[in-house]
Regions:
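Juxtamembrane/disordered regions of integral membrane proteins
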Residues: 1-165
Length: 165
């Protein structure tokens, strides 16, 4: 975990881009129907990954913005309601912080993605925003949860451990 402001910024950038890359690969694969083919996501191609990486360049910035403005603070506040660092296991508190941050970030980023990809770039009517957002959230939440818990957060902690040692 970061011990000062500089480390916190680096941690935030790595975590934001780890999440953006994973979620963009997932969403691009779904958009291109990869999950519907026999074998599902094992049919992923470098073309899908390349397109996702291009989108992740700017979506990572959106993740940083949302997490800095309200995602991290609200997630920490929610976690503090169920976890007391003085009494509870530190690992439990870390998991609660991650889970509560996902509870805030996934709906926020799903809304941002709906506005960017469905409304602005896709031309969907604004009155469809609530329905499209709900569908996007339902699609993204399981992936965001498991990607964060088992890939992005462990990778970020490992990378920061190596960078800050």
């Amino acid at each position: 975990m970061p011990k000062n402001k500089k480390q916190g910024i680096i941690f935030g950038i790595i975590m934001s881009y780890s999440m953006a890359i994973g979620m963009e690969i997932y969403n691009n694969a779904i958009q291109q129907g990869i999950h519907l083919k026999p074998g599902g996501f094992t049919n992923l191609t470098y073309g899908v990954v390349g397109h996702a990486l291009l989108e992740a360049l700017f979506m990572g910035l959106v993740v940083i913005l949302v997490s800095e403005l309200w995602g991290n603070r609200l997630g920490a506040r929610l976690a503090a309601r169920v976890c007391d660092p003085a009494k509870d296991n530190p690992f439990f508190c870390r998991l609660m912080r991650q889970g509560c941050t996902i509870l805030v970030m996934c709906p926020s980023m799903s809304l941002a993605a709906t506005i960017i990809f469905s409304m602005i770039l896709g031309g969907a009517p604004v009155w469809q925003l609530p329905a499209i957002w709900a569908g996007t959230l339902i699609k993204n939440f399981p992936m965001a949860f498991f990607w964060n818990m088992f890939a992005a957060a462990p990778f970020t902690n490992w990378a920061c451990g190596k960078l800050f040692e």
